[in-house]
């Protein structure tokens, strides 16, 4: 069993407002993220993602940053972080992100018309974040080469499914009876 799968099976579950969350180093920063787990995930992303001709890796703050930084270092592809803070810089594009549990305004800089991008995130659950990002990138005129999320939490409505985009994932899980259940250890292609 690989480290990602094992770490998810051992993840604590919390409930907040009727929504069951697994607490995991990739999605939450706790417990501590072991380098071997991060390395395994980065290697899997590099093997699964379409990286040819990608100009930029685009990721939302905050929990996509550590994964995307490591992928950027391994591939020499520059990293763009979509932030929750507006700076008012030239070319800044706002987007509205709505998930099953939060709503935020986010801001994209340094992505231009014609850029070929890989969208990378930690978890695909409701699809609200990735759907909003893909829509904003499309409005900018960027070419979305691929979308990858490390973990897919199945069992709920996924906004990305009703968009023209789909996400590759490394592993698909659900939370049943207070435990993480592995639905597909290879994720979606």
Curated annotation (Swiss-Prot):
EC numbers on record: 2.4.2.-
GO MF entry, a single one: transferase activity
Entry annotated with the keyword Transferase: yes
Gene3D superfamilies according to UniProt: 3.40.50.2020
Short name of one Pfam family: Pribosyltran
Coiled coil region boundaries: none
Keywords: Purine salvage, Transferase
GO biological process, one term: purine ribonucleoside salvage
The family this protein is said to belong to: Belongs to the purine/pyrimidine phosphoribosyltransferase family. Archaeal HPRT subfamily.
HAMAP family xrefs: Hypx_phosphoribosyltr
Protein purpose: May catalyze a purine salvage reaction, the substrate is unknown.
This protein's name: HGPRTase-like protein
Organism of provenance: Natronomonas pharaonis (strain ATCC 35678 / DSM 2160 / CIP 103997 / JCM 8858 / NBRC 14720 / NCIMB 2260 / Gabara)
């Amino acid at each position: 069993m690989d480290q990602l799968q094992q770490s998810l099976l051992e993840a604590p579950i919390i409930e907040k407002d009727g929504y069951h969350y697994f607490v995991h180093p990739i999605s939450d920063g706790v417990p501590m993220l072991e380098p071997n787990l991060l390395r395994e995930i980065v290697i899997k992303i590099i093997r699964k993602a379409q990286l040819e001709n990608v100009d930029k890796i685009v990721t939302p703050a905050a929990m996509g940053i550590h994964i995307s930084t490591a992928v950027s270092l391994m591939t020499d592809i520059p990293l763009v972080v979509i932030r929750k803070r507006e700076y008012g810089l030239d070319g800044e594009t706002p987007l509205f992100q709505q998930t099953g549990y939060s709503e935020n305004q986010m801001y994209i800089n340094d992505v231009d018309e014609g850029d070929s991008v890989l969208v990378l995130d930690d978890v695909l659950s409701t699809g609200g974040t990735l759907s909003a990002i893909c829509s904003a990138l499309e409005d900018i005129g960027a070419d979305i080469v691929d979308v990858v999320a490390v973990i897919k939490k199945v069992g709920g409505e996924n906004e990305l499914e009703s968009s023209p985009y789909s996400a590759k994932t490394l592993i698909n899980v659900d939370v049943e009876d207070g435990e993480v259940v592995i639905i597909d250890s290879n994720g979606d292609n």
